[in-house]
Each structure stands twice: as C-alpha cells, then as structure tokens.
C-alpha cells in the first residue's frame, strides 16, 4: 500500500532506538499534521521522523488536504494498468493480422526482379524463326562466390563484368547465360537473343533502341504488334538479410500476358541465308532481291554492307552507310529501264529497225553506245541484246514523252511501294512532262538516264511483271500475324491484287528477247544456267567521281530464272562501283545456283 505513495516510507525494525518490533518511519516534512497522530517523534541528526508501529499505520494523505489512498483505489490502479497492457497487446495482434501491414512486412524481406518484356519474333514463310535464333536464359543470381564460379563461363563479357561487380551485393539479380541452367542445377527462364551473331535479313527487319522498341525497319513499323502492351513477367524472391534465398523457398514467377504477336514474313530463311552468303563474297556495297514470280512475294532481301546490332554507334561513323537498306533506296537506273520502252513499243505494235552508227546527235548533244561501237541495222530484240542506246533514243522519240511516262507509271515507277505501315520503297523520280519537252532530256530518259531514279524494289516489280505474263503485282513481305503459343495465324495480311499491264503475248515476246540478252548479248556471264535465264544489264552514271577522277557507276542486273515458266525474279545492284570483281550477271548466276540447291 505504502509503495503507491509519492514519498519515501521506510519499514524497519527499530531496536537500537528502544522501539521493539516492526515500525514505519516517515519524515515529518513529507506529510501534513493529520498524519502525526498516534506517532512517536524521532530525530536522527538533522532529520525528523514519526515512527508508527506497523499494525497501527495511519491513513496517509499527500499534498494539502489530500484524501487517503484506500485499497480499492490501489486495485483500480492495477486494473487500469492491466487494461492498458491488454489494449496494447490487442492492437499489436490486429496490426500483425492486417493484410496491408502483413504485405508491407513481407515486402521488406522479398525482392522482385523484372524479366525482359516478351517481344514477338519474326518467322519465315515456312514458320522458321528469323529472330531469337540463339538460345539464352535469364537466371537469378544470389550473393556468393559459388554463383560467380558456376556462371562465369556461361555468359558474355558484359555478364562477366556484372558477376564480378555483384559478388558481394546483398540482393539477388538477373543474369543472361548461354548454357542450359538445368545442367548447373539452376532454374532458367528463356530469353533468346534477338539477333544472331551472323545477321539474318538485317536491313529489312531493322533493330531495337535501348528501351527495346523498334527503331528501324519492320521492327519499327510493326512495333505495336510485336510488343503488345509491353507488360513484364517478374520473379519474386523471399530473401534473408544477406540477400540469399530463404530456406525452403523458391523464386515465384508472376506471368504477365502482353498480347505480343509474332509476324510471319514471305522471306525464305534458307534462301535468305544463301543469298546473303553470295552478297558477302561478291560485293562491297549494293543489294540483291529475290521475288517469287507467281506472287511477287519477297523471298530474300539483302543489303550490304551490314552493321553490328550490338555496336550501333560504331556503324554510325562508317563512310559506307551500313544502315541504308539499299533495296528500298532510289538510284540512277540505266539500261535496266529499256524493257519499259520495249513493252510500250510492243503494246503499240511497233518493232522498228534503225541503223546504229555508235552515236546519236540530239540538239547538238552526242549520245554514244557503250564504247562508241556501231551496231549496224538493229531491231528491238537486237537493241536489247546489244543494249543499243541510239536505238532506244529513236524509239523514245517515236513513242513520245507522254507514252513513255504512262508506261513507266504502269510499271510502278515514280510511286512508293509500301511494305508495311511506315516502311516503303522510295518513290524515286520520273522527269516532269515539261522537262521531257526538251529533246535532250527525252533522249536521256529513253535509255534510263537523266533525272530518272528508281529503287531496286521497283526494278524487281518491272521484271516480275514481264516474267508473270504481263500482270503487275506490288512486291510484299508480310504474310500473317501469329499466336506464338499455338503457332496459328491470328490474321492473314492482305496481299495486293494483280493488274494487267501488257498482254501475255507481248510479255512472252519480251521474255524471249531478254533470254537472248543472256545467251548472246551483254549478260553472257549468266549463260549456262540450268533451265536458262533472261535479263538485262545496266550501267548508270552517277556524276560522282573518285579522287583519281574515275566516275562511280551503279551496276545493275535484273532478270528471271528459269527461262521457261520462271519461278524467281532477281535484281542485283552494285552502287557507286568503280572496279568490281564480279559483274551483276555473274552474281545473278550464283544466286540462281543457290536457289536451285535450295529447291
């Protein structure tokens, strides 16, 4: 009872003071006069006390006129204290059970790792991968030397540097590895490398930026389809304070469906790879296109030089412009344009014969045949075979500027060729009618020079029309979008309908003339192919010169194979060439050989 008072009370045995038994001492200055009754005064030094026998303790009050502290009040105090403790304990229990607080507490002992967002792949016409060819896995690395030793040999230089820096970090992290994690006793999550070490269909597909979105080519044009919502799957790891996985726990995968779709192209992977090998061994700058003659579907599209998708910044500084997709750029055309005039003449019922003296003078300007060599009496077939400039200048004069422009437009010149939304072959350039009112400009246009520009894809469409019995079809590369889980098409992409440009009979006549060009004319480097072939060479002046004064030229060959019932239309361009080891016709022949080998 007295322990509840706010002043010191001493319960002692007073034997030396002559007071036997147990007594209570209270200093006189700590309580009021009412407490003095029944007590004995006692002085020790400067302190005065009142002494009370323990059985007869008085009712004590504190302060002025304070009431006594009864036993009931003491019980009430104890009860209040117990109630307070009970309230605190209940509150702690409720906090521990509340989901939000429980989640916060759990979060302090879990680490969430975000896996790379899933991006749809590109597939070829037979459903074979064009991207994601190199298997890779994401594995969760926990602190410690053991993971460092196990994984160091399974990752590239960047991954090795990450491992070295993170050996002592107190948190798990993701690492890309090239070997199957199951062999190391680890769980891996597939994350194939987007592009192969040896590029495949590089310029057509394009590349990604640092955020994983398309920055060029089809990657950019189809970014919304390939990336979907962009949601990421993630791994939740319950970890200790040292960052290691808690005993009995495993990383928990939280799947996220981004809705990303794959895209199937018309490209044939074996044909593309084979044509890329031909280009790499025969040209330093240019492109090769291969079209399926019956449909105008693009089976291969190659542009050189290539760039390194892992070191894009280095390629930006290169003088040979490796980022250009030369199949879609426009160039000076040259003699591969002459079949347009031949087709217009056949449709007009014209097959004139002219005398070639090796040069033609128009408004005081001299236009020469190659080397200035006279060809004598030439008809349309011989003019194509010998690539006689003088003949086509006179034919252009006979047909007239309007007919030439109409024929060029019918074959797709001067118009962009869309391959996907935001991706198209350049429109190139046709001379304006008022420009062709000048006889010199009409002469230039008649054999593919002057202001005429065209993309290799447009030239491919021209020769494909001739090979396909006179029906023009715009080249295309998109076939369908795919559900990558089932491999089934989600949407079959629309293909352009054909339209007749010249009669089937005239197309057959023109094909026969182009076969003669290969067998006896300027394209004999392509002669001797199994099944024969037809085509046309072209050398276009660019007006650009080397420091030594040699003009750079665009060297073309466009044709079809085999000669009867053509299966493929092929265009070869070597741009800005000075000296080349292989002619366009020779490169064409190599492409035909690999097509035959591919079946």
List each language-model region with its residue ranges.
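N-terminal amphipathic/hydrophobic targeting modules at extreme N-termini
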Residues: 17, 38-41, 45-48
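Beta-lactam-recognizing serine transpeptidase/beta-lactamase-like catalytic domain environment
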Residues: 131, 250, 292-335, 343-576, ...
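Periplasmic/cell-envelope proteins involved in peptidoglycan metabolism and beta-lactam response
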Residues: 5, 9-12, 22, 26-31, ...
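Polybasic, lysine-rich low-complexity intrinsically disordered segments
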Residues: 4, 16-17, 34
């Amino acid at each position: 009872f007295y322990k509840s008072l706010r002043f010191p009370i001493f319960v002692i045995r007073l034997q030396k003071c002559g007071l036997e038994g147990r007594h209570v001492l209270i200093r006189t200055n700590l309580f009021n006069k009412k407490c003095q009754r029944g007590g004995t005064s006692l002085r020790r030094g400067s302190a005065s006390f009142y002494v009370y026998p323990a059985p007869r303790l008085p009712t004590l009050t504190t302060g002025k006129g304070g009431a006594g502290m009864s036993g009931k009040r003491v019980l009430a105090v104890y009860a209040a204290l117990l109630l307070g403790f009970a309230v605190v304990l209940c509150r702690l229990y409720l906090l521990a059970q509340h989901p939000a607080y429980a989640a916060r507490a759990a979060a302090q002992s879990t680490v969430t790792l975000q896996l790379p967002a899933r991006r749809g792949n590109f597939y070829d016409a037979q459903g074979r991968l064009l991207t994601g060819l190199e298997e890779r896995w994401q594995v969760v690395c926990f602190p410690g030397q053991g993971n460092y030793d196990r994984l160091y040999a399974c990752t590239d230089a960047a991954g090795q540097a990450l491992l070295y820096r993170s050996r002592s970090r107190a948190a798990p992290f993701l690492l890309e590895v090239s070997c199957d994690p199951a062999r190391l006793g680890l769980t891996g999550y597939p994350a194939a490398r987007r592009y192969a070490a040896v590029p495949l269909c590089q310029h057509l597909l394009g590349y990604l930026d640092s955020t994983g979105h398309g920055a060029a080519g089809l990657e950019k044009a189809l970014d919304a389809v390939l990336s979907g919502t962009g949601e990421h799957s993630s791994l939740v790891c319950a970890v200790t304070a040292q960052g290691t996985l808690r005993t009995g726990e495993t990383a928990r995968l939280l799947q996220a469906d981004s809705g990303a779709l794959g895209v199937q192209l018309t490209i044939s992977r074996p044909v593309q790879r084979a044509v890329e090998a031909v280009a790499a061994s025969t040209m330093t700058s240019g492109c090769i296109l291969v079209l399926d003659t019956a449909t105008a579907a693009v089976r291969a599209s190659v542009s050189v030089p290539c760039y390194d998708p892992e070191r894009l910044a280095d390629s930006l500084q290169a003088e040979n412009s490796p980022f250009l997709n030369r199949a879609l750029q426009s160039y000076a055309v040259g003699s591969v344009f002459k079949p347009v005039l031949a087709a217009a003449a056949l449709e007009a019922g014209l097959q004139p014969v002219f005398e070639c003296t090796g040069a033609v003078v128009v408004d005081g300007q001299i236009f020469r045949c190659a080397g200035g060599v006279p060809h004598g009496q030439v008809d349309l077939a011989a003019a194509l075979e010998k690539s006689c400039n003088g003949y086509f200048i006179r034919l252009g004069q006979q047909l007239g500027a309007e007919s030439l422009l109409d024929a060029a437009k019918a074959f797709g010149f001067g118009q962009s060729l869309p391959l996907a939304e935001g991706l198209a072959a350049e429109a190139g350039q046709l001379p304006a009618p008022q420009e062709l009112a000048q006889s010199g400009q009409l002469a230039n246009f008649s054999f593919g020079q002057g202001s005429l520009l065209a993309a290799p894809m447009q030239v491919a469409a021209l020769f494909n029309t001739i090979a396909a019995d006179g029906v023009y079809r715009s080249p295309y590369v998109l076939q369908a979008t795919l559900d990558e889980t089932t491999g089934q098409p989600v949407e079959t992409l629309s293909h352009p309908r054909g339209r007749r440009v010249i009669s089937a009979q005239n197309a057959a006549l023109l094909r026969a003339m182009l076969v003669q060009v290969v067998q006896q004319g300027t394209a004999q480097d392509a002669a001797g192919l199994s099944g024969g072939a037809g085509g046309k060479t072209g050398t276009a002046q660019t007006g650009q010169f080397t420091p030594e004064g040699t003009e750079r030229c665009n060297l073309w060959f466009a044709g079809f194979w085999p000669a009867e019932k053509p299966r493929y239309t092929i265009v070869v361009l070597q741009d800005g060439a000075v000296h080349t080891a292989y002619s366009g016709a020779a490169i064409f022949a190599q492409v035909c050989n690999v097509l035959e080998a591919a079946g």
